[in-house]
Amino acid sequence: MKWTISCLQFDISYGKPSENIKKAEFFIEKESKHADVLVLPELWTTGYDLANLDELADEDGRSAQSWLKKTAKKHGVHIVAGSVAVRKNSDVYNTMYIADKEGQIIKEYRKAHLFQLMDEHLYLSAGSEDGYFELDGVKSSGLICYDIRFPEWIRKHTTKGANVLFISAEWPLPRLDHWKSLLIARAIENQCFVAACNCTGSNPDNEFAGHSLIIDPWGRVLAEGGREEGIVRAEIDLQESAEVRESIPVFDDIRKDLY
């Protein structure tokens, strides 16, 4: 089985959900004819306007889910819908939704690791469940930005069988080298595909790196964006993950008696 995955890399308008939704719809309209799965960046409706999240957050995720269901069904495409700020009671979570091409929400994942350097912990609550899901029978996982710095968290998903890691981010330009190195390492050590969608542009506090990446289980970069807005697309052969795991049986050699 093969998938074409497209990362929709764009400049997120700071604190302006209506503008960002229009931009996402433009890219989805443009790319849905060419891909099986579309991936959006982190906090793509609001950007990191953390100080105003109390006002901007989507109550129970109702607006985001309604939009996502209609959009995925209209275009007949699976969407890993980046993440949005969702209010649940008194908490706000950095939340990823995944919709299948029939317009059904099949997974909700809340970012588990909050990045204190950008004050996330002051405005957001951390999730406590993993991002594992199956899409068209393909074992997959969704993760958000800072999560990729925690290999133990990634391994939890791949030991459940995930062959594709979908990652949404707002990764800053000064740490672009970390972004690339971490993603390639996660692909190699877990023998899986990685599709990582970053944003570009800037906000009042940060300049973002772009360079969305699609990586195969050997750690080879299949597609990479630049600093500008655009589509990062690659076709992947999903059988390759199983073949790599068979050729170098890392998972069979894990020393559970030691770690």
UniProtKB/Swiss-Prot annotation:
Pfam annotation, one family: CN_hydrolase
Keyword set, alphabetical order: Hydrolase
Occurrences of domain CN hydrolase (ranges): 3-238
Catalytic activity: 2-oxoglutaramate + H2O = 2-oxoglutarate + NH4(+)
InterPro entries named among the record's database cross-references: C-N_Hydrolase, C-N_Hydrolase_sf
Keyword Hydrolase recorded: yes
Any one GO molecular function term: 2-oxoglutaramate amidase activity
Active-site residue list: 42, 111, 145
E.C. number: 3.5.1.111
Disruption phenotype annotation: Impaired growth on methylthioribose (MTR) as sole sulfur source.
Family statement: Belongs to the carbon-nitrogen hydrolase superfamily. NIT1/NIT2 family.
Role: Involved in the methylthioribose (MTR) recycling pathway. Probably catalyzes the conversion of 2-oxoglutaramate to 2-oxoglutarate.
Annotated protein name in UniProt: 2-oxoglutaramate amidase
